[in-house]
């Protein structure tokens, strides 16, 4: 089934706001041709819909450091009327995708705009905004709950993410096996660890290269 992405999720490093407990998120992501087909499969397996949200993920970069080369990410996410600041650290494993994730809720749109000002004051610039429609399902057994995200990403395509959170490293391997089995049941194959931001920028670069005028010089991503 390809590569398996593993992310370590940790609440915000600012102890004032969020606790210090670590979580390990095991994730598989697959491109799909038909979201509707996967939705039907999930419903037949008994997964429960948690609703639909429209998400806008705005990513930022420090031009002097180049976050892409450092393999880190800073973003502000708007999910309907909720806002979050997220930092994703570099991959911690050469074979699997293991990342530290630090996330802090922002009170409202004004707080999100103020945070953009803070990031700008630190020298960060907006790179791109990833827009997607996300429909979430959850399926639980006696041991755990698996979250399924059906994503329709603007300029990129359709994807399904399978996510399972465990509390210790010992739970990672069983979680991977469980997700692989579920992916088989859903008929999914060809998993990817490429982020939506990377896909979006690659798509835009390809479109620009194919345009009659070709790529513009010194374009800032």
Language-model region placement:
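N-terminal amphipathic/basic-hydrophobic helices that include classical n-h-c signal peptides
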Residues: 1-22, 215, 219-220
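A generic structural motif
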Residues: 165-170
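Short, flexible, solvent-exposed loop/turn segments with mixed acidic/basic and small polar residues
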Residues: 15-21, 90-94, 148-156
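Acidic (Asp/Glu-rich), glycine- and aromatic
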Residues: 173-182
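N-terminal strand-loop-strand beta-hairpin
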Residues: 21-143, 180, 186-221
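Charged, well-structured binding/catalytic surfaces in domain cores that contact anionic ligands
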Residues: 134-158
């Amino acid at each position: 089934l390809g590569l398996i992405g593993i992310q370590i999720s940790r609440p915000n490093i600012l102890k004032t706001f969020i606790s210090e407990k670590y979580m390990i998120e095991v994730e598989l992501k697959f491109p799909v041709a038909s979201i509707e087909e996967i939705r039907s499969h999930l419903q037949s397996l008994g997964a429960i819909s948690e609703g639909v949200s429209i998400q806008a993920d705005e990513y930022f970069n420090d031009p002097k450091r180049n976050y892409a080369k450092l393999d880190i990410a800073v973003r502000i996410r708007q999910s309907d009327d909720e806002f979050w600041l997220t930092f994703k650290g570099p991959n911690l494993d050469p074979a699997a995708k293991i990342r530290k994730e630090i996330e802090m809720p922002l009170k409202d749109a004004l707080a999100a705009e103020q945070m953009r000002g803070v990031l700008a004051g630190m020298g960060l610039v907006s790179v791109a905004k990833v827009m997607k429609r996300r429909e979430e399902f959850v399926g639980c057994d006696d041991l755990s709950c698996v979250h399924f995200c059906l994503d329709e990403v603007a300029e990129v395509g359709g994807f399904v993410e399978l996510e399972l959170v465990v509390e210790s490293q010992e739970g990672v391997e069983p979680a991977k096996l469980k997700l692989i089995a579920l992916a088989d049941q859903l008929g999914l194959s060809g998993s990817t660890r490429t982020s939506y931001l990377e896909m979006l920028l690659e798509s835009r670069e390809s479109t620009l290269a194919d345009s009659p005028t070709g790529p513009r010089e010194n374009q800032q991503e």
